[in-house]
């Protein structure tokens, strides 16, 4: 039965007429759902569209809402008008301010020109008055000189008095007469000196080299004119002890009074003595040993732990002068090179006394005498100083010595008595290398009032000369 039904269905579906009918039914069903424009007639709207329609309907039906909307539009238009008015007003105010500024600037320029012209006129008038006053003073001095030889008459006296009164009538004459009095001159000198000192301090600060204690120059204070005591009595003064020291001494005295402490001290004394003897024996054997290994260890110890010569000299310098500074010392030497070399070439012993020792001054004077006796004169000129550096520091006896090396460029020229060039020339430039030995002079050698030691040039050596031109 089932097979028959299947065969029947297949035969029915294969018929062409039946297929056409089924197709027409399907097309008709589709066309019934679509309109002429191709869209379906039954369209479903969203929830938002319906909500917007309701709001529009309520707005159209509500007259108050329409009034508020109109008011908002009117206010917006008014605000736009206000903005335009503000723009116009700002432009007008800026133009007015610019015009006022130009007017003020022109007025200031005119006033400045007037002031400058008036100042120039006053200055020229003052200079003329000063010149006239000087001329009057010269004429008065000439008249007084002539009158001293021939005797002054009454008419000449009246002329001098009238000239002096005319001079005193002027402003500068009054000022000059007021300054001539000793009281006013002293009153003016004090603030002037104070102002000069202040200006010097400000200049030093601006240049970067503020006034410090100098290491090379020493200006002794004025001598003491008062009475000095000659009494040499010795007075014993008790030492002041603090509270802790007093408590410690009282505790130590109490402990020494106990018998236990006495026994311990008696037992410790032989032990301490024996240990000291053993340590001394070991030290003697170590120092007097002939073993090469011991000698090598001693040499290594000396090389590593021994203080160098420069360190010991610098330590001695700081012990004598705690405020010593190497950079300041080098800068002072660089400033002193030019005057010292110029004074040495000219034989100026007065200038050399400020910087050099007695031995170097004596050598300079002897050399200068020898050259002048032979008719030679040095016409050197120092051009440039550079590369000032500390070369070495060492001890010379008990005084420290610092060796400074620098180089200069100078014109080498030697003349005779007639001024003729014997050696070198005005255009011969040499590079000269110098070594200076600066020795520290103790404060006791300078005087009683000296607090810190100073440095003196003990020896000067020309290490080499190189011709440039």
Curated annotation (Swiss-Prot):
Induction: Up-regulated after antimycin A or rotenone treatments.
GO CC annotations, alphabetized: mitochondrial inner membrane; mitochondrion; TIM23 mitochondrial import inner membrane translocase complex
Keyword Zinc tagged: no
Transit peptide endpoints, chain numbering: 1-44
Chain spans, region Disordered: 133-169, 208-228
Keyword Membrane carried by entry: yes
Coiled coil residues, start to end: 60-97
Biological process per Gene Ontology, one example term: protein targeting to mitochondrion
Stored InterPro entries: NTF2-like_dom_sf, Tim44-like, Tim44-like_dom
Subunit structure: Probable component of the PAM complex at least composed of a mitochondrial HSP70 protein, TIMM44 and TIMM14. The complex interacts with the TIMM23 component of the TIM17:23 complex.
Function summary: Essential component of the PAM complex, a complex required for the translocation of transit peptide-containing proteins from the inner membrane into the mitochondrial matrix in an ATP-dependent manner. Recruits mitochondrial HSP70 to drive protein translocation into the matrix using ATP as an energy source.
Full protein name: Mitochondrial import inner membrane translocase subunit TIM44-2
Encoding gene, per UniProt annotation: TIM44-2
